[in-house]
Amino acid sequence: MPSSIKPKKLGHLVLKVRDIHESVRFYTEVLGLEVSDWIEEQMVFLRCGSDHHDLGLFQLPDNSPDLNNISSEGSPGLEHFSYEVEDYREVERAISILQEKNIEIVRGPGKHGPGENVFLVFRDPDGNFVEIYCEMVQVTEDQPYEPSVWEDNLDAFDQWHFKKFVVDPPALYEEKLKKSELS
């Protein structure tokens, strides 16, 4: 008997949203997702590939609190979710699209140390962090991977040291950036 469940991949994510129609416009017009199905005006299922859905949106009641006005820093919960794109050119194209649509870019583009993936993070209409990424290290039977422990420094967060960022680096990393410039 196996000692643990062995998932194949992350299947889908469901977000609670304040305006389901605004969110559908965002995810279809900005990220290019396609609508698979609706449950009346209460829930919608969207996809980017062959699975019926990888994102569900659930309409909150009108009297729900605006959690964007409540600090969630240091609280458990979703930090971000991500979609893979073909290559770095698509990340660059995404920057232009986001800027043209006045969508807040939060961080990137950068290149994480762990996973070596290129990333770009922006906000959806409800303030959730959405990441697109490419070029992540693949771990297969033919390409085994030995886990390592990364030092909590600039290289772990962004191997490019914010040189390609189109926004200011996160405050958390400004001190690490100063230290790396002194070395």
Model-derived segments and spans:
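A detector for short, charged/polar N-terminal pre-domain segments
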Residues: 1-3
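A short, Lys/Arg-rich alpha-helix, primarily the initiator
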Residues: 5-9
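Eukaryotic phosphotyrosine signaling hubs
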Residues: 10-12, 76-80
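Mature N-terminal segment immediately following signal peptide/propeptide cleavage
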Residues: 12-15, 34-35
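Vicinal oxygen chelate
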Residues: 17-21, 82-129, 134-140, 146, ...
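Amphipathic alpha-helical segments
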Residues: 21-34
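Short secondary-structure junctions
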Residues: 32-38, 105-109
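Conserved short beta-strand elements that form part of the metal-binding/catalytic scaffold
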Residues: 34-76, 114-116, 123-125, 129-137
